[in-house]
């Protein structure tokens, strides 16, 4: 395999000149640049990009840590990250964890070993205190009280409260909520908003009306049947996921339960499925979050100060409330 010295000899220039051409240095004459390119083509030279990056102290690779790629929320987030990474010529390495701590730690070990230049945690099981034990640029796509990490998020407590107030203004007091998991930081803020809203309207908090482990359309269908078995039924369910909302809506329709007359559904995401089914939802700019997550992490890798950004949200009225 040809090396830089071989190219220099064939082109009749110095090794320094070849290096300048390969690294796109401006101070090389067009004649010499042309001769170097011709020599590279003749010798079928392929630049070892990985070696170049390592010599400069970075891998040109960003790690993206997420529980699954099979949900539209994470797919949208990755799409935004990928769009921004492509514009910067940076490659992505995905770490799918299923919220398993050891898999998250493996991703962190790749950062420690400089296999990636930084990590974007889309969602995680590890506590922030555990992340503090690891060095390197780490960005969180969620709220965090820890000032060590750059973050990008929406104000989940405020957005959820906005949705609850909307339901209350529509006449609903018996409201259930459905989350992906109760342990997450975002869910912590949502439950807090829920309790505060109930207290203000004089309704008791009911633990059984806080449903979790629901992320798919089938989970939404199961949620309908859970609702249907309750002796005292909530008149509205606030679901933190468009997929679950879609399953709930479709099963209600299949069972001839009128939405919103018998059951109102409010969702979060504003993905295509909620648009197609006419589900009222809160747009949280998932793709934009991914783009800005990459931009913030890239600046951090370059040594710029920690940035903590909060995106806007908006409630989109359709036909399910």
Curated annotation (Swiss-Prot):
Pfam families assigned to the protein according to its UniProt record, in alphabetical order: LacI, Peripla_BP_1
Domain HTH lacI-type: 1-56
The entry's DNA-binding region: 4-23
Protein name according to UniProt: Uncharacterized HTH-type transcriptional regulator YkvZ
An example molecular function term from Gene Ontology annotations: transcription cis-regulatory region binding
PROSITE patterns named in the record: HTH_LACI_1 (PS00356), HTH_LACI_2 (PS50932)
GO terms for biological process, alphabetical: regulation of DNA-templated transcription
Annotated keywords: DNA-binding, Repressor, Transcription, Transcription regulation
UniProt superkingdom: Bacteria
Species of the source: Bacillus subtilis (strain 168)
CDD domains to which the protein is assigned, alphabetical: HTH_LacI, PBP1_CcpB-like
Entry-linked PANTHER family: CATABOLITE CONTROL PROTEIN B, LACI-RELATED TRANSCRIPTIONAL REPRESSOR
Stored InterPro entries: HTH_LacI, Lambda_DNA-bd_dom_sf, Peripla_BP/Lac1_sug-bd_dom, Peripla_BP_I
